[in-house]
Amino acid sequence: MQTLDTPLTPTSTPSLFDTTIHRRKTRGVKVGDITIGGGYPVVVQSMINEDTLDIDGSVAAIRRLHEIGCEIVRVTVPSMAHAKALAEIKEKLIKTYKAVPLVADVHHNGMKIALEVAKHVDKVRINPGLYVFEKPRADRTEYTPTEFEEIGEKIRETLKPLVLTLKEQDKAMRIGVNHGSLAERMLFTYGDTPEGMVESALEFIRICESLEFYNIVISLKASRVPVMLAAYRLMVKRMDELGMDYPLHLGVTEAGDGEYGRIKSTAGIGTLLAEGIGDTIRVSLTEAPEKEIPVCYSILQALGLRKTMVEYVACPSCGRTLFNLEEVLHKVREATKHLTGLDIAVMGCIVNGPGEMADADYGYVGKQAGYISLYRGREEIKKVPEDQGVEELINLIKADGRWVDP
């Protein structure tokens, strides 16, 4: 689904009042046949919720996601048995469908699991707070610098084999920090803060860099949007200071479900994307994973970062509206939603209609009772009876050679 053949090159300095989003320059990191960062389109990903030991169920779930536009699919790997199951999943996926970029999610004391699963996936996600898990001590009041360094060295020794394995195979790692699972020593040193999240990520980045491994993607997720925003912004600031250009994976973890879950995810992900921050996104909903993908693409389209569907412009309706706007918009959407790359405006009256739809490819405007005016761009093409409006709009699109059958 990745649509850009060559990376974009910024042509001007961003302005506060620029209507174009200027994305932060990052290095490209390959995950299978998809590139995260490097000027490529923001990548959409999700995670299956099947047990990885269920080979057929996992293959079917991965395929369902990929077929609707999920470009990278993550699977959970809580044990060695799950890690080995990935070999069968990948083999069956290729045999019955095609290769799909896969990510393994590894958590508690997962070094051996990560080494095994690295053979079968394109990227391994580790959680710095859990990869080398130190059981909290109830009587602890501080971490001395010596203790801090000793655990840091243990982390290095544990992480090194995985880094070298991924480096040898030219695969990727996501250093995925979660606000809710920071290591105890980070909590004691920095508190339950965005600073602790950023320092947790930087510790692992430095280990990777010391081993000359740079195929790294970073995430700093939280269930509270303000914490998530602060963590990513601080991460960008620190990386800029240190000369790092790693791509960022955006997400609000545990966003919930329904309308609020979507709004919460959009508030976090959309805000950062609008600032030029972010190279891949995952909307985490307490729903079927397939429900996450349209939300991702809608966020990207609303910001002008990727255009994968029709952009509908429609007024909210008022006393001047000359037809049932909600009903007509529904009819227009149902007739044209399979198209891509078009802007279609449905406006209720002549007062704001032509001006508000000036950037649209096609316009459907109520000018007098019982009749619809159809526009191509700013040009009025014809006036037709209201009951023929949708059909004639389709005919106009067809006449321009921009129609495809659903």
Curated annotation (Swiss-Prot):
Question: EC number(s) on record?
Answer: 1.17.7.1
- MF term (GO), any: 4-hydroxy-3-methylbut-2-en-1-yl diphosphate synthase activity (ferredoxin)
Q: What does this protein do?
A: Converts 2C-methyl-D-erythritol 2,4-cyclodiphosphate (ME-2,4cPP) into 1-hydroxy-2-methyl-2-(E)-butenyl 4-diphosphate.
Q: Which reaction does it catalyse?
A: (2E)-4-hydroxy-3-methylbut-2-enyl diphosphate + 2 oxidized [2Fe-2S]-[ferredoxin] + H2O = 2-C-methyl-D-erythritol 2,4-cyclic diphosphate + 2 reduced [2Fe-2S]-[ferredoxin] + H(+)
Q: Which Gene3D superfamilies match?
A: Dihydropteroate synthase-like, Sulfite Reductase Hemoprotein, domain 1
Q: What is the lineage of its organism?
A: Bacteria, Bacillati, Cyanobacteriota, Cyanophyceae, Oscillatoriophycideae
Kindly list the positions annotated as binding [4Fe-4S] cluster.
Answer: 315, 318, 349, 356
Protein's name in the database = 4-hydroxy-3-methylbut-2-en-1-yl diphosphate synthase (ferredoxin)
**What keywords would UniProt list here?**
4Fe-4S, Iron, Iron-sulfur, Isoprene biosynthesis, Metal-binding, Oxidoreductase
Q: Which class of enzymes does this protein belong to?
A: oxidoreductase
List, alphabetically, the Pfam families matched: GcpE (PF04551)
Entry cofactors: [4Fe-4S] cluster
Q: For this protein, what does the record note about how its cofactor is bound?
A: Binds 1 [4Fe-4S] cluster.
Please give the family membership noted in the entry: Belongs to the IspG family.
Q: Which source organism? A: Gloeothece citriformis (strain PCC 7424) (Cyanothece sp. (strain PCC 7424))
